[in-house]
């Protein structure tokens, strides 16, 4: 049994659409009727230190307009249900994850990857993003695969723990751990200050 496991490489990817200021304006507009909460919102955002966040979904031209996104899926007064959001996840998440994997494995012998672990709590579809990554990224069809879902940020820690157990039990194993989240997919209309602040903390990305 191998005594140690190591993180050999790390790669990341973010979508093309920078949306932080747009979402700040959208969130602030939800507090127009609550000036005290809006002032508190602005102070807390300034203290956050966040400058940029990215989304797989292009924002609309006007953050105060009827449509929040360019496609018109998020319309004020009629935000989409879970079904549309999961279809959007299925459309966008594999491509974003594939970008990170391609950066990680550039110039590497991909046949050496024996296991893939994917974590995500912002979307799900079947048969799964793990299969999409295997096909898109040219991984072995015999690779062993696992999805850790709906555990929040802690899922990444569990993925590392599982990878460690795998490598310690088989010294020939090489585990690819992929953490992908589309947090901006779950924006909602609300006047709740805490929820609006949470929308302004998280973005889309993969590591």
Predicted regions and their residues:
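Conserved "HGTGT" condensation-loop signature of ketosynthase/thiolase-family condensing enzymes
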Residues: 1-113
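Acyl-thioester C-C bond-transforming condensing/cleaving domain
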Residues: 2, 32, 87, 97-112, ...
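Short strand-loop junctions, especially beta-strand C-caps/beta-turns
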Residues: 10, 119-121
């Amino acid at each position: 049994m191998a005594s140690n496991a190591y993180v050999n490489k790390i790669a990341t990817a973010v979508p093309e659409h920078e949306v932080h200021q747009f979402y700040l304006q959208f969130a602030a507009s939800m507090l127009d009727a609550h000036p005290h909460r809006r002032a508190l919102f602005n102070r807390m955002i300034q203290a956050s230190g966040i400058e940029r966040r990215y989304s797989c979904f292009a924002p609309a031209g006007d953050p105060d307009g009827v449509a929040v996104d360019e496609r018109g899926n998020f319309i004020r007064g009629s935000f989409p249900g879970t079904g549309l959001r999961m279809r959007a996840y299925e459309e966008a998440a594999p491509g974003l994850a594939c970008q990170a994997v391609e950066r990680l494995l550039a110039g590497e012998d991909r046949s050496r990857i024996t296991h893939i672990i994917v974590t995500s709590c912002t979307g799900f579809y079947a048969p799964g993003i793990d299969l999409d990554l295997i096909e898109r990224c040219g991984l072995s069809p015999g690779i062993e695969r696992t999805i850790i879902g709906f555990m929040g940020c802690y899922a990444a820690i569990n993925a590392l723990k599982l990878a460690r157990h795998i490598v310690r039990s088989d010294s020939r194993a090489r585990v690819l751990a992929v953490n992908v989240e589309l947090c901006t997919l779950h924006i909602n209309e609300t006047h709740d200050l805490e929820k609006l602040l949470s929308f302004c903390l998280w973005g889309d990305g993969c590591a």
